[in-house]
């Protein structure tokens, strides 16, 4: 396919889209991604995943702090037919949106207009949504407000985590992009305006939202654990030890349970009494320690029913 494509993306979610374009014979004339950032315990300067993927494919990489007037002219000089944007991390302004012949299209990890914004995967899990999907959208200057080109739905399973859903939606998005690219470049798709009904926003999760509140119902806490797994993990003070809860399930409680205490411990996990039912923790990571099963954790620490959890 002899098309001049500019690709813009940054995290792991965007890599399958870039890979799919190259595998389909569409080598972007340029890749834009965020600058290298300090990461990890040593705060070493680390390239974003899209940069590593682009270099693996031998593609030219640009890493501006923002897409300003100078960058818009750089893109214009590339004479692109289309700009493909996947989790780039910036809202594009009109001076960029108007440059490509067929504009800019975005791969978004929700069924728009539900969950516009930065954290659609986590918000869908927190809300207990039964399905989500990917929307291919013609970009405008708003926050995920542009008209839709295509959508693909997928169910959310009962044990879905943010990690597993992220990987599946990234693959769905890549396939959706490649499947509809010929129509987009032929001007053969009529964009469909997003409906006014059903609009919700997916703000980034705050630090406070990572804490589990044992006074909430167990089902709600389980959703929070899954929405924060595997990274960064839901936080909890288990007795005297702060931990990250990586896997848990809601189960039935007992009349004598006191919310915010350890209800039971055993080979299956650590059961915490909540506002409604119990939360059985099966995998966790203590502060400064390694990820482990609850059984392994109990082998090295004494935890008894009645201890406080907060």
Curated annotation (Swiss-Prot):
Catalytic activity: L-methionyl-tRNA(fMet) + (6R)-10-formyltetrahydrofolate = N-formyl-L-methionyl-tRNA(fMet) + (6S)-5,6,7,8-tetrahydrofolate + H(+)
One of the record's GO cellular component terms: cytosol
Keywords on record: Protein biosynthesis, Transferase
Highest taxon in the source lineage: Bacteria
Record's keyword annotation contains Iron-sulfur: no
Molecular function, one GO term: methionyl-tRNA formyltransferase activity
InterPro entries: Fmt (IPR005794), Formyl_trans_C (IPR005793), Formyl_transf_N (IPR002376), Formyl_transf_N_sf (IPR036477), Formyl_transferase-like_C_sf (IPR011034), GART_AS (IPR001555), Met-tRNA-FMT_C (IPR044135), Met-tRNA-FMT_N (IPR041711)
EC number: 2.1.2.9
Sequence positions that bind (6S)-5,6,7,8-tetrahydrofolate: 110-113
One Pfam match: Formyl_trans_N
Gene3D superfamilies: 3.40.50.12230
PANTHER family tied to this protein: METHIONYL-TRNA FORMYLTRANSFERASE, METHIONYL-TRNA FORMYLTRANSFERASE, MITOCHONDRIAL
Family: Belongs to the Fmt family.
Job description of the protein: Attaches a formyl group to the free amino group of methionyl-tRNA(fMet). The formyl group appears to play a dual role in the initiator identity of N-formylmethionyl-tRNA by promoting its recognition by IF2 and preventing the misappropriation of this tRNA by the elongation apparatus.
Protein name per its UniProtKB record: Methionyl-tRNA formyltransferase
Native source organism of the sequence: Halorhodospira halophila (strain DSM 244 / SL1) (Ectothiorhodospira halophila (strain DSM 244 / SL1))
């Amino acid at each position: 396919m002899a098309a001049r494509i500019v690709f813009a993306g940054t995290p792991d979610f965007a890599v399958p889209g870039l890979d799919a374009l190259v595998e389909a014979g569409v080598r972007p004339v340029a890749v834009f991604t965020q600058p290298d950032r300090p990461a990890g315990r040593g705060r070493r300067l680390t390239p974003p995943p899209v940069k590593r993927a682009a270099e693996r494919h031998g593609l030219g990489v640009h890493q501006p702090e923002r897409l300003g007037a100078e960058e818009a002219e750089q893109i214009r000089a590339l004479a692109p037919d289309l700009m493909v944007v996947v989790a780039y991390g910036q809202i594009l302004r009109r001076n960029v949106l108007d440059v490509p012949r067929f504009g800019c299209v975005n791969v978004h990890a929700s069924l728009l207009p539900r969950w516009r914004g930065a954290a659609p995967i986590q918000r869908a899990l927190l809300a207990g949504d039964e399905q989500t999907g990917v929307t291919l959208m013609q970009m405008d200057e708003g926050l995920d407000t542009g008209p839709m080109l295509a959508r693909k739905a997928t169910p959310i399973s009962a044990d879905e985590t943010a990690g597993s859903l992220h990987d599946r939606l990234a693959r769905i998005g890549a396939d959706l992009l490649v499947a509809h690219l010929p129509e987009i470049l032929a001007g053969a798709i009529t964009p469909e305006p997003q409906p006014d009904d059903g609009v919700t926003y997916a703000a980034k999760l705050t630090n406070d939202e990572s804490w589990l509140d044992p006074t909430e119902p167990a089902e709600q806490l389980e959703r929070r654990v899954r929405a924060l797994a595997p990274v960064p993990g839901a936080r909890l003070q288990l007795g005297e030890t702060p931990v990250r809860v990586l896997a848990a399930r809601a189960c039935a409680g007992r009349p004598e349970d006191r919310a915010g205490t350890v209800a039971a411990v055993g080979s299956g996990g650590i059961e915490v009494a909540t506002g409604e039912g119990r939360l059985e923790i099966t995998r966790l990571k203590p502060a400064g320690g390694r990820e482990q099963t609850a059984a392994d954790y109990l082998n090295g620490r004494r935890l008894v029913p009645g201890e406080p959890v907060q």
